[in-house]
Amino acid sequence: MTRAEVLERLRAHRPTLAERFGVVELALFGSFARDAATEASDVDILVRFDASPNWRDYFGAQFYLEDLLQRPVELATRDDVRAEMRPQVEREAVDV
């Protein structure tokens, strides 16, 4: 799967993610955002919810994305990203 394919799938399913899980922002980062993913790569996604997510929304969104992309997904809010990693993540993030 390529960066373009991941972005296309995420964009197509963004309304469902918003409706079912309260997702208001998505951004791709990591190896797929850099177009450097391998067969073993997971998909790194920054997410923002409309409210503080409960575990059903957070993990529901993660499992939905894993089914959609057929790969492991690392879902993170901006607050989850360690301070020393944040500048790199924000530089490479591709808004969906």
Model-derived regions: residue spans:
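Conserved histidines in hydrophobic membrane contexts and catalytic metal-binding motifs
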Residues: L28
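Catalytic core of pol beta-like nucleotidyltransferases
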Residues: M1-E25, A33-E39, D50-V96
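Short hydrophobic/aromatic beta-strand micro-patches
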Residues: L46-R48
